C-alpha cells in the first residue's frame, strides 16, 4: 500500500505529557486519542501500546519515548509520552523530543509531588515555552482538597517562572474519558481547546535567522572554499553576507554559490544538506565546529551554565563519580571541545545517574545561544548530555 502523503494544511505543534509517576500521563495520552478518534481526528491508541515505548538513541543516550499523533480542528499535534521518570529527564535535557508546549498532569488525589516539581523546573530550564495543567482523578478526590491543590500548583508554577495565575487548569478524569464517560470526554475536549489556544504556535525553523554548522570543508580550484553541512535554521541566498563563528575570531564572507546533491540552487533552507561556496575564505580558515550564520545573530562563547544528565553505569556511562574541575569533551553540533566543569556550592561530587546545574568553561569558543544541546564525552564515548541555560561571558 502506498504511504499517505503528509498534509500540511494545519500548523504543526510538538507537545508532551509531563508530571509525577502514576499521576496518569499515559492514561491521558490514550484518552486524548480515543476521544479525538470519535471525530476522525486520531487513531485510538491503547494504554499498553503507549506504555511499551520503543527505545531510541539521541546523542548517544538510550531513551524510551512513545510518539502519538492527532489533530484538532485548528492544529496537527505530535505528542510524546515517556514511560519512566529517567526517560523524561533525558528527553528534556537532550532535546530528543523538542516540545513546543507540555501538558502537566497532576493527580487531584495527591497534588504536586517531587517529580512534579522536577519536571516544572526542567521545563523552565530547557525553555519549554508554555504549560497547560490537567488535574486528573478529580472523580475520586475531595472537592475542598482540589481547591487547595489548584492554589498550590499556581504558586509552584509562579515560583519556577511560569505565569501561574494565567495557566489554564482543566479538571477531569483520564480513566473515565477512556471508558467513554460523557463528563470525562468533555474534560478532554476542554483540555484540547486550552492546548490549542494557550500553547503558542512555534516559529518554523525556516523563518529563524540562517545558521549552518560546518561538517566538512573542500576547496574548488579557481573558485574557492566550500563548507558543507545541514542547514539548521533559516534560508540562505546567493550573494548574501554571512559570518563564520566559533573556534577562532569571527570573520565575514559572502556566499557565491549553493550546491545540493551536485545541483546548483538559488536558495538553501532549513533541513537541506548543502555546500556553500564562500568568497575570500581559505581552506584553512574553515573547520568542523564552526558555524556559518546570518551576521550578528550568534556569538562565540566559552563560559556557560548548563543543566546536565550524567549517564548511569548500566547506560554505558562512567562507573565512578566526578568532582569539580572534571575535564571531559563537550560535543556541540559537529565537534568536541574540552571544557572544565565547576559544581554548584555544596555539591561535593556527581554520581552516575544524577542530573544537576553546572558551570562550564571551554578551551575554545563555540557559537551558542541559550537552549543549545550538547553531549558530554570521554574519548568518544558519551557519558552525559546537557542544555545551555545561561551564557556567562
Swiss-Prot record:
GTP binds at residues 19-26, 81-85, 136-139. One of its GO terms (molecular function) is GTP binding. Residues 136-139 are annotated as: G4. Residues 60-64 are annotated as: G2. Mg(2+) binds at residue 26. PROSITE patterns: G_TR_1, G_TR_2. It is an enzyme of class 3 (hydrolase). It comes from the Bacteria. Residues 10-203 form the tr-type G domain. Residues 19-26 are annotated as: G1. InterPro entries: EF-Tu_GTP-bd (IPR041709), EF-Tu_GTPase (IPR050055), EFTu-like_2 (IPR004161), EFTU_2 (IPR033720), G_TR_CS (IPR031157), P-loop_NTPase (IPR027417), Small_GTP-bd (IPR005225), T_Tr_GTP-bd_dom (IPR000795). It holds the Pfam family GTP_EFTU. GTP hydrolase that promotes the GTP-dependent binding of aminoacyl-tRNA to the A-site of ribosomes during protein biosynthesis. This is Elongation factor Tu. It comes from Chlorobium phaeovibrioides (strain DSM 265 / 1930) (Prosthecochloris vibrioformis (strain DSM 265)).
Amino acid at each position: 500500500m502506498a504511504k499517505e502523503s503528509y498534509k500540511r494544511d494545519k500548523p504543526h505543534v510538538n507537545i508532551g505529557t509531563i508530571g509525577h509517576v502514576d499521576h496518569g500521563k499515559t492514561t491521558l495520552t490514550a484518552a486524548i486519542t480515543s476521544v479525538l478518534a470519535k471525530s476522525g481526528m486520531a487513531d485510538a491508541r491503547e494504554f499498553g501500546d503507549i506504555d511499551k515505548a520503543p527505545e531510541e538513541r539521541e546523542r548517544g543516550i538510550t531513551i524510551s519515548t512513545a510518539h502519538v499523533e492527532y489533530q484538532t480542528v485548528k492544529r496537527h499535534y505530535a505528542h510524546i509520552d515517556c514511560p519512566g521518570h529517567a526517560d523524561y529527564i533525558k528527553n528534556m535535557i537532550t532535546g530528543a523530543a523538542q516540545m513546543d508546549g507540555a501538558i502537566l498532569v497532576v493527580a487531584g488525589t495527591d497534588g504536586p509531588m517531587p517529580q512534579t516539581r522536577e519536571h516544572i523546573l526542567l521545563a523552565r530550564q530547557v525553555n519549554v515555552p508554555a504549560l497547560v495543567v490537567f488535574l486528573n482523578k478529580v472523580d475520586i478526590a475531595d472537592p475542598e482538597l482540589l481547591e487547595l491543590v489548584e492554589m498550590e500548583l499556581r504558586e509552584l508554577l509562579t515560583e519556577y517562572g511560569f505565569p501561574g495565575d494565567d495557566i489554564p487548569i482543566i479538571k477531569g478524569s483520564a480513566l473515565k474519558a477512556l471508558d467513554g464517560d460523557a463528563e470525562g470526554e468533555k474534560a478532554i475536549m476542554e483540555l484540547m481547546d486550552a492546548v490549542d489556544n494557550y500553547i503558542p504556535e512555534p516559529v518554523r525553523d525556516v523563518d529563524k535567522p540562517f545558521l549552518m554548522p560546518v561538517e566538512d570543508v573542500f576547496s574548488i580550484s579557481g573558485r574557492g572554499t566550500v563548507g558543507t553541512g545541514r542547514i539548521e535554521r533559516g534560508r540562505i541566498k546567493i550573494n548574501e553576507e554571512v559570518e563564520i563563528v566559533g573556534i577562532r575570531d569571527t570573520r565575514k564572507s559572502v556566499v557565491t554559490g549553493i550546491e545540493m546533491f551536485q545541483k546548483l540552487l538559488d536558495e538553501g533552507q532549513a533541513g537541506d544538506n548543502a555546500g556553500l561556496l564562500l568568497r575570500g575564505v581559505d581552506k584553512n580558515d574553515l573547520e568542523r565546529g564552526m558555524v556559518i550564520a546570518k551576521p550578528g545573530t550568534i556569538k562565540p562563547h566559552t563560559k556557560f551554565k548548563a543543566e546536565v544528565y550524567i549517564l548511569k553505569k548500566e547506560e554505558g556511562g562512567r562507573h565512578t563519580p566526578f568532582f569539580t574541575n572534571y575535564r571531559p569533551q563537550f560535543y556541540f553540533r559537529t565537534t568536541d571541545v574540552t571544557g572544565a566543569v565547576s559544581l554548584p556550592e555544596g555539591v561535593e561530587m556527581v554520581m552516575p545517574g544524577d542530573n544537576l546545574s553546572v558551570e562550564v568553561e571551554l578551551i575554545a569558543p563555540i557559537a551558542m545561544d541559550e537552549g543549545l544541546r550538547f553531549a558530554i564525552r570521554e574519548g568518544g564515548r558519551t557519558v552525559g548530555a546537557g542544555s545551555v541555560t545561561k551564557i556567562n561571558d
